[in-house]
Every structure is written in structure tokens, then in C-alpha cells.
């Protein structure tokens, strides 16, 4: 019997019974809170936007501190993601905050692939968590979760419409991260222009099918405030770490020749709304949505690529063991097929090599025969030449002998005549 069937039977047959006295499991929420507080929390924010829109300043303002960071320039050859992690403490609650900023976003002439490094970074964090989950010995409670929980998308305060770069990037990211669009440096445009700009942005997002993060309304305790805040998206924000004295209080504000803009004055901007929604009310929901929605989508796609499925082709439940066995058999079949292909390839290559060697041997024999015949011909020529030379030598010797004989005969005849003449003179 499958585990799902057992669970279903237990659920259907479960009875509600009263307790005769106090047991103690009502302290489970307190236990969970104490454990969570002791372990601490992590929250990862991705700031996407063009250089100079005040991403770093807004982060400083949101968390009421000064994060150390290098200023970005407009001369980056491509988009780079810069990640910094900080340990924050508020009361007795610890928060490991990671801020990831897109350096050089929108600064290139060709912006077609500007979104790719961002998508690759988000997927890399999902992949790292998945690899940790798939380990035999998992230590997820000590693992530093680097998955992005919230993406603050900074929109330039043009007052007209979204840039094509913004639409393309948000469309590529909406299935991977919780996008919260915000209008940066909103004090650069008038209130009437800002209202029209918000409407225009919302309309373009809907028309292009971009899914932004909606504050949850299923929890009664926050349903009203979240429903109200959803209507204010995208938030128009201003960031400032400078404090000015307004009345009798020191407040974060920006001083202009025409007046003062207070960061925490809701009549001036939506900074307080953003801080409340992002940190105080919905931080845990953002973490949960990242794990249960975006990460699960990535995990499911990856496991399906690996061949793991929950159901067979007939939509019947498929256990992990059955999936493993099916995948193992498939792998063994592929392995045998590969082995047979390699064997056939090896045999074919051996035959080809044998044919090459036979052809080479034949060529060597033919070359040997040619050289042998050439050697014999040369030898015969040399023998004929030697015989001819020997004949010439013998003929020369014969001629020499004859000449010497004639010479000796001539010498003897000459001597006889001389003696004869001498005798005649004496007489």
C-alpha cells in the first residue's frame, strides 16, 4: 500500500477527542520561536536597476545603517553582480542580510543580454541549495541560504513609461524571484506626473504579462493592510542618510532650494510603505514564497530533466524507488547500447586497420620487388661493363706484348748491321 493511501486513510479516520487536563503541547509555538531566534534568520535582497538610481542609499535608509560598498561607475563592459553579507541585530533577533547589486546594468550600448547575468546568478543560488539537499549527509540548518528572497526593481523616474530593458528583465525574472517594483528618486517628478506614471507602469506590466509580487491577503491579521498596499504598487521612494532638523525632531530628509523632502513622511513618498511591507509585515512570506514557489519550480524542472517524475505516463503515482529502478534500467540499457556501439566501432576500426596494414604490406612487397629488379639490372650492367673492361685490358696487354716483341726484334737487327759495318771498316 502506498504511503499516500495510508495517509489518506489516517486522515479520514481521525477523530477529535477532548483532553482531560493540561498536556503541554500548547508550548510548541514558543519552542519554535525560541529555536528560530537562537538559529537566527537570513534575508537576501537583489537590487536591480541602472547605475545612479540610489540603490545603495535606499538600502542604507531601509536598515538604518551605513553599509560599506564601492561606488559603481558607468564604464562597466558588462553587467556584474556584487554580493555583500552583513550580520544585523535588533533586540535579541539576529539577521544575516545579503544585498546583491547589479553593477553596470543598463550602461552598455547593446542591452539585449543585460538580464542574463542576473538570471544565471539566481539559478546558481537555487542550484547550490539543490545540491545541498541532494547530499546524503545534509546540514541545511547550518547551510547559508543564498537564494534571493526579494528583488527590488528600481525604475528610473522618467514620468513616461517603462523602458524595454525593464520589461524584458522583469519578464525573465518573474518566475524566479519575488519582484517588487519601485520608482527610484521619485522627488524628481511632480505628484500629478507620479500618479500617472504609476498607472502607466501597472498597465504595461499587466499588458506584458509580468507577474510582480503581491502582498498576501489570505492571512486575516495582515489581509487589510496588504490589500491596501497592493493598490499602491509600484512604490515611489526616496533614500537619504542625511538627517535634518524639522521642527523639534531630527529626520531623514533631502534639502532642496524649493523645500525639504522627508523620507519617512508618507505624504512625500512611499518609503514607509516599502519598509513596512518588505521588512515588518511580509519578510517571512517572501522567504516562504521563495522556497515553496520559485525554488520548487526550479527543483521540479531539474529533477524532471534528470528523469524523476511523480506519475507514470498513465498519471498513476510513481514512487521514488520505481523512478530509480526505471532510471537505472534505462541507464543500463543505454550503457549496453553504448558498449555494443563501441564494440562495433572497435571491430570496424580493427578491420580498417588490418586493411590498411595489408595494403601497406602489399605496397612494401611491390617496392621490394622493384628495388630487387633494379638491383639485378644494375648488377648485370656492372658485370657487363667489367667484362668489357677486362676484354679491353687483355687486348691492350696483347698489343703491348706484340709491340715489345717488335721492338726487341728491331733492336737485334740494328745491332747486327752495326757490327757488320764495323768489320767492313777494319778490312
UniProtKB/Swiss-Prot annotation:
What region holds the Septin-type G domain? 39-305
Q: Which residues carry this modification: Phosphoserine?
A: 27, 416
Keyword match Acetylation: yes
Which terms does the UniProt entry file under GO BP? cell differentiation; cytoskeleton-dependent cytokinesis; protein localization; spermatogenesis
What segment(s) does the record annotate as region G4 motif?
Answer: 184-187
- Where do the segments described as Disordered lie? 405-427
Which portions of this protein are annotated as coiled-coil regions? 321-416
Give the SUPFAM superfamilies listed for this entry.
Answer: P-loop containing nucleoside triphosphate hydrolases
> Which InterPro entries does the record match to this protein?
G_SEPTIN_dom, P-loop_NTPase, Septin
Annotated spans, G3 motif: 101-104
Point out residues bearing the modification N6-acetyllysine: 367
Annotated region described as G1 motif, given as residue ranges: 49-56
Annotated Gene Ontology cellular component terms: cell division site; cleavage furrow; kinetochore; microtubule cytoskeleton; midbody; motile cilium; septin complex; septin ring
Residues annotated to bind GTP: 49-56, 104, 185-193, 239, 254
Comp. bias (Low complexity)? 407-417
Q: Where primarily located?
A: cytoplasm
What does the sequence similarity comment in the record state about its family?
A: Belongs to the TRAFAC class TrmE-Era-EngA-EngB-Septin-like GTPase superfamily. Septin GTPase family.
What role is this protein assigned?
A: Filament-forming cytoskeletal GTPase. Required for normal organization of the actin cytoskeleton. Involved in cytokinesis. Forms a filamentous structure with SEPTIN12, SEPTIN6, SEPTIN2 and probably SEPTIN4 at the sperm annulus which is required for the structural integrity and motility of the sperm tail during postmeiotic differentiation.
Subunit (UniProt): Septins polymerize into heterooligomeric protein complexes that form filaments, and associate with cellular membranes, actin filaments and microtubules. GTPase activity is required for filament formation. Filaments are assembled from asymmetrical heterotrimers, composed of SEPTIN2, SEPTIN6 and SEPTIN7 that associate head-to-head to form a hexameric unit. Within the trimer, directly interacts with SEPTIN2 and SEPTIN7. Also interacts with SEPTIN9 and SEPTIN12. Interaction with SEPTIN12 alters filament structure.
Any miscellaneous information on file? Coordinated expression with SEPTIN2 and SEPTIN7.
The protein's name: Septin-6
Q: Tell me which species this is from.
A: Bos taurus
Amino acid at each position: 500500500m502506498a504511503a499516500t493511501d495510508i495517509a489518506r486513510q489516517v486522515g479520514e479516520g481521525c477523530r477529535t477527542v477532548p483532553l482531560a487536563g493540561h498536556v503541554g503541547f500548547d508550548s510548541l509555538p514558543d519552542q519554535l520561536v525560541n529555536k528560530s531566534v537562537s538559529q537566527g534568520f537570513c534575508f537576501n535582497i537583489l537590487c536591480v536597476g541602472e547605475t545612479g538610481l540610489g540603490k545603495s542609499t535606499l538600502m542604507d535608509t531601509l536598515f538604518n545603517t551605513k553599509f560599506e560598498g564601492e561606488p559603481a561607475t558607468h564604464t562597466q563592459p558588462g553587467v556584474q553582480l556584487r554580493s555583500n553579507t552583513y550580520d544585523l541585530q535588533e533586540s535579541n533577533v539576529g539577521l544575516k542580510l545579503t544585498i546583491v547589486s547589479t553593477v553596470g546594468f543598463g550602461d552598455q550600448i547593446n542591452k539585449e543580454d543585460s538580464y542574463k547575468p542576473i538570471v544565471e546568478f539566481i539559478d546558481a543560488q537555487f542550484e547550490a541549495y539543490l545540491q545541498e539537499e541532494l547530499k546524503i549527509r545534509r546540514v541545511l540548518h547550518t547551510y547559508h541560504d543564498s537564494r534571493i528572497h526579494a528583488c527590488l526593481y528600481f525604475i528610473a523616474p522618467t514620468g513616461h513609461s517603462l523602458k524595454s530593458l525593464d520589461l524584458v528583465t522583469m519578464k525573465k525574472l518573474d518566475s524566479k524571484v519575488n519582484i517588487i517594483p519601485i520608482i527610484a528618486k521619485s522627488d524628481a517628478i511632480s505628484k500629478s506626473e507620479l500618479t500617472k506614471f504609476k498607472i502607466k507602469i501597472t498597465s504595461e506590466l499587466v499588458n506584458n504579462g509580468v507577474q510582480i509580487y503581491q502582498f498576501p491577503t489570505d492571512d486575516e491579521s495582515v489581509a487589510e493592510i496588504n490589500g491596501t498596499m497592493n493598490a499602491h504598487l509600484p512604490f515611489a521612494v526616496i533614500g537619504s542618510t542625511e538627517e535634518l532638523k524639522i521642527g523639534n525632531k531630527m529626520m531623514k530628509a533631502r534639502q532642496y532650494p524649493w523645500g525639504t523632502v522627508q523620507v519617512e513622511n508618507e505624504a512625500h513618498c512611499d518609503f514607509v510603505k516599502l519598509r513596512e511591507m518588505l521588512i515588518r509585515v511580509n519578510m517571512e512570506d517572501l522567504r516562504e514564497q521563495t522556497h515553496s514557489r520559485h525554488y520548487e519550480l526550479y527543483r521540479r524542472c531539474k529533477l524532471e530533466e534528470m528523469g524523476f517524475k511523480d506519475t507514470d505516463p498513465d498519471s498513476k503515482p510513481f514512487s521514488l524507488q520505481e523512478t530509480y529502478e526505471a532510471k537505472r534500467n534505462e541507464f543500463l540499457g543505454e550503457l549496453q547500447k553504448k558498449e555494443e556501439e563501441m564494440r562495433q566501432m572497435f571491430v570496424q576500426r580493427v578491420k580498417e586497420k588490418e586493411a590498411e596494414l595489408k595494403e601497406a604490406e602489399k605496397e612494401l612487397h611491390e617496392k621490394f620487388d622493384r628495388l630487387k629488379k633494379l638491383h639485378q639490372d644494375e648488377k648485370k650492367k656492372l658485370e657487363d661493363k667489367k667484362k668489357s673492361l677486362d676484354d679491353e685490358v687483355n687486348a691492350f696487354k696483347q698489343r703491348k706484348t706484340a709491340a715489345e716483341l717488335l721492338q726487341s726484334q728491331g733492336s737485334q737487327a740494328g745491332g747486327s748491321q752495326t757490327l757488320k759495318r764495323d768489320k767492313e771498316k777494319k778490312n
